[in-house]
Amino acid sequence: MNEAVKDSEWYRQKFLYPNGTLKNKLNITDAAELAQKEYLGSGIRAVTFLRKNKKISSVEDLKKIHKIMFGWLYDWAGQIRDYELVKGETEFLEYSRINFGIEEIDEKIQQLSSKKELANVDYAFLLDRLNYLHPFREGNGRSSKLFLQAFAANHGQVIDYPRSNKDLIIAQNNADIDQIASLIRVNAKAKKAAH
């Protein structure tokens, strides 16, 4: 573990204002206001990104997506974390092993890229590994879902995630790939009508 991370004061100073709100480029210190701006701004950027039909080939693309979604708000957007991360009782991949996690995901993406269509379990596997990797301070779920949605588009598919994140988060925290697969739906991408 990075020695500095053991010092929670270091962590607070790096990421948080004194009231506990994430430090941000807009200097918003009200957590509710920040959350509202973050969700709206990241959502608009996500839609814009999907319309560009980018090819997904590695975790490098996830870093770019995270930077697009959150770079307007956070200095650390798109940067792989260099510290240990625990949320509640969930521990994510140790920082010292992050490169191994990235390699595993990249290898799976390369393996799946040659397939015409992917199954729910293929996306569930990647979603599980991305969740455990948890490469960023915040925004991991949204950027991972966008990353996989773009990867699905590369295969002429669309992923429908459940309306409520609760069951999906539980399945991810339990690393239950079968449960994750049962919660997502993979459909053929609708073709645009010719005018």
Question: Language-model segments: what does each one mean?
Answer:
Residues 1-195:
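FIC/Doc superfamily catalytic core
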